[in-house]
Amino acid sequence: MGQKTALGTLLKAIGNSGQGKVVPGWGAVPIMTVIGLLLLVFLVILLQIYNQSLLLQGFSVDWNGN
């Protein structure tokens, strides 16, 4: 059998703490909704920068490498 380490003991305690338990009600839905919306906003901003429809002062987008 392998050695017992403090890190292994900590990770095992964290990993097994909620095993088999379901949070009643909405659970993690609100948190995941917020994270999803933030990701969507981030991707829309990236798309607007790529399409140059979002103009940033002092920031030029040149895809030719010039």
Curated annotation (Swiss-Prot):
Which GO-annotated molecular functions does the record name? phosphate ion binding
Q: Which cysteines are joined by disulfide bonds?
A: none
Please name the Pfam families in this protein's record.
PsbH (PF00737)
Q: What Gene Ontology cellular component terms go with this record? A: photosystem II; plasma membrane-derived thylakoid membrane
Work out whether the entry's keyword set contains Manganese.
no
Q: How does it sit in the membrane?
A: Single-pass membrane protein
Q: Which InterPro entries match?
A: PSII_PsbH, PSII_PsbH_sf
Give the UniProt record's GO annotations in the biological process aspect. Answer: photosynthesis; protein stabilization
Keyword check for Thylakoid, yes or no. Answer: yes
- The portions of this protein that span the membrane are 27-47
The record's keywords, sorted A to Z, are: Membrane, Photosynthesis, Photosystem II, Thylakoid, Transmembrane, Transmembrane helix
Localization terms from the record: Cellular thylakoid membrane
Q: Which family does it belong to?
A: Belongs to the PsbH family.
Quaternary structure note: PSII is composed of 1 copy each of membrane proteins PsbA, PsbB, PsbC, PsbD, PsbE, PsbF, PsbH, PsbI, PsbJ, PsbK, PsbL, PsbM, PsbT, PsbX, PsbY, Psb30/Ycf12, peripheral proteins PsbO, CyanoQ (PsbQ), PsbU, PsbV and a large number of cofactors. It forms dimeric complexes.
Its annotated function is as follows: One of the components of the core complex of photosystem II (PSII), required for its stability and/or assembly. PSII is a light-driven water:plastoquinone oxidoreductase that uses light energy to abstract electrons from H(2)O, generating O(2) and a proton gradient subsequently used for ATP formation. It consists of a core antenna complex that captures photons, and an electron transfer chain that converts photonic excitation into a charge separation.
**HAMAP family in alphabetical order:** PSII_PsbH
Q: What is the protein's given name?
A: Photosystem II reaction center protein H
Q: Which organism is it from?
A: Prochlorococcus marinus (strain MIT 9515)
For this protein's source organism, the top of the classification is: Bacteria, Bacillati, Cyanobacteriota, Cyanophyceae, Synechococcales
